[in-house]
Structure formats: C-alpha cells, structure tokens
C-alpha cells in the first residue's frame, strides 16, 4: 500500500497576474551563511494556477503543491491571506 505524502504549502506575495488563470508569486527566505554568519535573503518565483483570477498584485497568498499543470506550473492557489 502506498503512503500518501502531505502536500507542501508555501506563502508568498503576488508579483504578476497578467496571464490568464496564472499568477507569479515570490517567496523570500532568510538564511544564515554557514561560515560568514550573515543573514542572506533568497527569493524564488513560483508559477501558480489561479482558476478564477481572484488575486491581484501585492496580495499575500497561500499555495499548495499539485500535479503538473503545465511546463512551469506545479502549484495551485489555496487562499488569499491578505489583500493589498
């Protein structure tokens, strides 16, 4: 019997909603450099499926992992945490 994996969830800010049913979000991580001990900000962009086009630029959103929807889309919009 296969074990079901828990789907990953992430929170990020919408940086673009110019495509149909697709938004781009940016997730920022704070990582401490192992040798220099300086805090570094790392950013990563995710293409997210937004079925009803409800999010706008600047919104804080929560996304969840899903099956591949296109070449770059592996995430789906779960909810809008905070409107701009």
From Swiss-Prot:
Pfam families: Ribosomal_S17. It comes from Karelsulcia muelleri (strain GWSS) (Sulcia muelleri). Part of the 30S ribosomal subunit. One of its GO terms (molecular function) is rRNA binding. The lineage of its organism: Bacteria, Pseudomonadati, Bacteroidota, Flavobacteriia, Flavobacteriales. The keyword Ribonucleoprotein applies. GO terms for biological process: translation. The gene is rpsQ. This is Small ribosomal subunit protein uS17. CDD domains: Ribosomal_uS17 (cd00364). One of its GO terms (cellular component) is cytosolic small ribosomal subunit. Gene3D superfamilies: Nucleic acid-binding proteins (2.40.50.140). Belongs to the universal ribosomal protein uS17 family. Coiled coil: none annotated. One of the primary rRNA binding proteins, it binds specifically to the 5'-end of 16S ribosomal RNA. Keywords: Ribonucleoprotein, Ribosomal protein, RNA-binding, rRNA-binding.
């Amino acid at each position: 019997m296969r074990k079901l994996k828990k789907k990953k969830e992430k929170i990020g800010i919408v940086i673009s909603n110019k495509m149909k049913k697709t938004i781009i979000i940016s997730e920022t991580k704070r990582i401490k450099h192992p040798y220099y001990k300086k805090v570094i900000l790392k950013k990563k962009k995710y293409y997210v499926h937004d079925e009803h086009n409800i999010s706008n630029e600047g919104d804080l959103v929560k996304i969840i992992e899903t099956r591949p929807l296109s070449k770059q889309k592996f995430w789906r919009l779960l909810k809008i945490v905070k409107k701009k």
